[in-house]
Curated annotation (Swiss-Prot):
Gene Ontology terms describing biological process: respiratory electron transport chain; tricarboxylic acid cycle
Membrane topology: Peripheral membrane protein
Name the record gives this protein: Succinate dehydrogenase [ubiquinone] iron-sulfur subunit
Boundaries of every 2Fe-2S ferredoxin-type domain copy: 24-99
GO CC annotation: mitochondrial inner membrane
Residues the record lists as binding [2Fe-2S] cluster: 63, 68, 71, 83
Organism expressing this protein natively: Porphyra purpurea (Red seaweed)
Length: 239
């Protein structure tokens, strides 16, 4: 039954709950929040609920400024960051799930072990085989090639919105990791492009992308992983 609400400042936050130690099925808890005494973002509401209503609620958070990517979750059907998502003024009920199609540790906390193992696989660091005694310099033009790529904060919103990643997360690297891979392919200081492309070759790691483009639509940083993936495909097909 939907709670009745005659107060525009009163919102009901409906949160997915599951605890591994409890054999019961997952459930929802509903928490009233007055926006007049709460911060403007969903993360503010979650912190207030944890502090004042239910200390057992589990979720990740850190910077509160859209930089760390910790508070990624599904809010009213969209993968986004709780710290950047305003509390809706035109909705009585806001529903929050963890990132979809991922194993859950507790409540809104997904298990990102596989995600970060894939990140490690692409060798996300500068590889330059030309010895140098000073720093590796980069022109402003070359640096500008990284705009729209390096800003990725590994929140996993895009990967968790990708149907190909849902069904092939053990093989397909997913949009977030492939965007990170392209970040190093596009870096003029890196000399390891050939080996990096070898890591991404084959049918499963890269070519499971079917350009559905959920990744680009959901990215809270307004990046375009789909474009980066297309660039990698072009490099492999025409190298």
């Amino acid at each position: 039954m939907r709670p009745r609400n005659n107060n525009l400042n009163l919102k009901f936050i409906r949160i997915y709950r599951w605890t591994p130690s409890n054999q019961a099925e997952a459930k929802f808890s509903v928490h009233p929040i007055h926006t007049s005494n709460c911060g403007p973002m969903i993360l503010d509401a979650l912190i207030k609920i944890k502090d004042e209503q239910d200390s057992s609620l589990a979720f990740r958070r850190s910077c509160r400024e859209g930089i760390c990517g910790s508070c990624s979750m599904n809010i009213d059907g969209i993968n986004t960051l709780a710290c950047l998502k305003p509390i809706k003024t035109n909705a009585n009920i806001i529903t929050i799930y963890p990132l979809p199609h991922m194993y859950i540790i507790k409540d809104l906390v997904p298990d990102l072990s596989n995600f970060f193992s894939q990140y490690k696989y692409i060798k996300p660091w500068l590889i330059n085989n030309v010895p140098k005694k000073s720093e590796y310099l980069q022109s402003e033009k070359d640096r500008s090639e990284l705009n729209g790529i390096y800003e990725c904060i590994l929140c996993a919103c895009c990967s968790a919105s990708c149907p190909s990643y849902w069904w092939n997360h053990d093989k397909y690297l997913g949009p977030a990791i492939l965007l990170q891979a392209y970040r190093w392919l596009a870096d003029s200081r890196d000399t390891n492009a050939k080996e990096r492309l070898k890591l991404l070759g084959g049918k499963s790691k890269l070519f499971k992308c079917h350009t559905i483009m959920n990744c680009s639509r959901t990215c809270p940083k307004s990046l375009n992983p789909g474009k980066a993936i297309a660039s990698i495909k072009h490099s492999i097909n025409y190298s």
